[in-house]
Regions:
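Short, intrinsically disordered, charge-balanced linker/junction segments flanking boundaries
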Residues: 356-361
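Substrate-binding/specificity loop regions of serine endopeptidase catalytic domains
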Residues: 342
């Protein structure tokens, strides 16, 4: 994962300073340890912390178009970027990188705000149209990638994490009491609320356009269930075939990377199915990772071992003890930027720290 951060002036005031956006993006180094990139002009400051996955040498952000009138910083991955790139090149667009980020730039040139409808991926995007002095923020359909923002002192400030916003001195630190009540009721805040007052999350499947000092947010995608249409009367085997086809296609697209790919194994059905597909559609040895527990009530190592033996993966297991959960709880709160009411996220965080030493996808 990468990290993005930015400052946009909503009124006439001093331009964003490099040290301001640098302070924000420094808070995101754990998301993108492979380098920082910046763009600043009179109106906006953009910063990006990069985790290199596609186009390791040439994919540094911000990415711009041919005449440098459109700039993009982006956290995530566009799975259908190869097909989109070919289509855009056929329409006359010229690329200077092999990255999936540049596809977003040229899609915007081609389709305007409808560019987002062409994306198959997980993403949070910030796009600056320098000619129109317009900022576009967009988040993927189900909100896999985070994006937060606040408005204060004539500025709109946004970032991948709240701690990045708080690194800016214009952003006050006040608890949102209503959001705290939501956490103890629903185990989570209700979007767009966060645990911090006047800091909001851009909802999944939404786009925000900031133009002439106005923030306009709209939903560009939603779940659709046609209740008036009768269900197809198909045998169970056909439904299973269609589901398998969709899963295979989803896994195949997500294997596009210029770095090694690994898989988590929980011992459950979902991770077992996905890992089996990955193993089938990759030529290189597959590394798998799992977490085990001292308490047999929570441990599923037996099921993990069965699949590891069946697939022949290169496996790494991490034993998470009760003391590990206790010791890592404060750091988990720092990462989640919210109240944690259960211990489940901590073992996954401990495992992820082990994984990131050799695998980033």
């Amino acid at each position: 994962m990468c990290g993005i951060a930015g400052i946009l002036n909503l009124m006439d005031r001093e331009p964003p300073r490099h040290e301001e956006v640098d302070a924000m993006v420094t808070q995101l180094q754990h998301r993108g340890p492979d380098g920082y990139g910046y763009f600043l002009d009179r109106h906006i400051g953009l910063a990006h912390s990069r985790l290199s996955i596609i186009d390791l040498a040439g994919g540094n952000q911000p990415i711009h178009n041919e005449n440098k009138s459109v700039y993009v910083i982006f956290n995530g991955e566009i799975f259908n970027y190869i097909e989109l790139r070919a289509m855009l090149q056929g329409a006359g667009h010229r690329f200077y990188t092999a990255s999936d980020t540049e596809v977003i730039v040229h899609l915007y040139e081609q389709y305007g705000l409808d560019f987002v409808h062409h994306l198959n991926g997980q993403f949070s995007i910030a796009l600056w149209d320098a000619n129109d002095k317009k900022l576009v923020l967009a988040r993927d359909r189900v909100g896999i990638r985070p994006l937060y923002y606040t408005v204060n002192n004539g500025r709109m400030i946004f970032a991948s994490e709240i701690k990045s916003l708080l690194a800016n001195r214009d952003v006050p630190r006040r608890m949102n009491i209503q959001a705290l009540g939501e956490i103890f009721t629903y185990w989570s805040t209700l979007t767009p609320n966060t645990l911090f007052e006047n800091i909001w999350s851009l909802p999944p499947g939404h786009m925000m356009v900031v133009h002439k000092g106005q923030l306009n947010t709209h939903r560009y995608w939603d779940w659709t269930f046609d209740t008036d249409k009768p269900a197809d009367d198909l045998p169970l085997q056909e439904w299973a075939r269609q589901l398998k086809s969709l899963l295979i296609d989803a896994v195949r697209l997500r294997l596009r990377a210029d770095v090694p790919v690994g898989a988590y194994l929980s011992g459950g059905l979902d991770s077992s199915v996905i890992t089996s597909f990955i193993k089938h559609y990759t030529d290189t040895p597959l590394r798998t990772f799992s977490v085990s527990f001292e308490d047999s009530e929570f441990d599923e190592s037996e099921y993990q071992r069965e699949l590891i033996k069946f697939l022949g993966t290169e496996h790494t297991n991490v034993l998470c003890r009760k003391a590990d959960i206790r010791d890592n709880f404060p750091r988990a709160i720092w990462h989640t930027e919210s109240t944690i009411l259960r211990t489940a996220p901590i073992p996954l965080m401990v495992l992820s720290e082990k994984v990131r030493k050799g695998v980033s996808v």
